[in-house]
């Protein structure tokens, strides 16, 4: 008689994805982030669900309801800060996961990669709308500034913005619909995650060498289940340290001031995980150009499979490409720093140079360096 986990239709699904899944024997800790992202999503959905039980999406009471959650609801402050800092953890894992994909050439699995880009966009949209919900100063002005960018679209721009707002400014209708979409999107993300895994399990995982590992596979359980549990433990510990010791470290103090349409904060800036894109947006003086650069800064990832000129898949044995990759990482950190700075003399030019370098590295320098490495292989 066959084992129930291999014969039962439902258990078979779980078995094929988490237990008997053949996995390369040499995947490193950089392959942990997929499962960590799954845990982040679960934490966000659960904490978000309980927060939604106490939150009211009305402009007059939204800020007050968040205060009520923190003061009067049992462990409401834990829920609120787990949710807010959980988003930061989510993005840290996302960036590391994408970085791993770039470094080891995982983008060669184009379907998995493209669904991943869709997921990145969906998570960014969810995070943006979630930031609006507490209805503080930065919530209101962030929503106003970012939605206003759509007015740069020729002909339909202004109508589109007013349609999204549900009026002539960010108001009750905007907050209500953002809450509705913020609640809905994580479930769409969950569905996309299933599609992402479906495509991944068609090809199997990549590994650090970038060489096919079909002849040397091991079962996912117990080897990688225990490895993932260690990663999860470290991440949850880091999240709890953040939540319990410095919950407001990554937030903006302006968001503790209730939204006031008559008073603009001195520096409008998004959460830290959007600062790199915000810096690229600000570095172009033209509105439409800035919006296009903003979208392309993420969409450019879809070109990675086309820009792969190397004969090797992974960067593991390509020192010149490694230099380019780490230069890209340093450039993104520079952009993140610039995004949080005021628009003043030294920062403007640094932001513009960093933006030019970002696109140059991905579109020109990395493919060129790969061609040079191919030539070096012939020597």
From Swiss-Prot:
InterPro entries named among the record's database cross-references: Cyt_b/b6_C, Cyt_b/b6_C_sf, Cyt_b/b6_N, Cytb/b6-like_sf, Cytochrome_b, Cytochrome_b_C_euk/bac, Cytochrome_b_N_euk/bac, Di-haem_cyt_TM
Any one annotated GO CC term: respiratory chain complex III
Annotated coiled-coil segments of the chain: none
Cellular localisation: Mitochondrion inner membrane
UniProt-annotated binding residues for heme b b562: 83, 182
Protein's membrane topology: Multi-pass membrane protein
Source domain of life: Eukaryota
Binding site for a ubiquinone: 201
Any GO BP annotation: mitochondrial electron transport, ubiquinol to cytochrome c
Transmembrane segments: 33-53, 77-98, 113-133, 178-198, 226-246, 288-308, 320-340, 347-367
Keyword Transport annotated: yes
Family matches, as PANTHER family: CYTOCHROME B
Protein name in the entry: Cytochrome b
Source organism of the structure: Cynopterus brachyotis (Lesser short-nosed fruit bat)
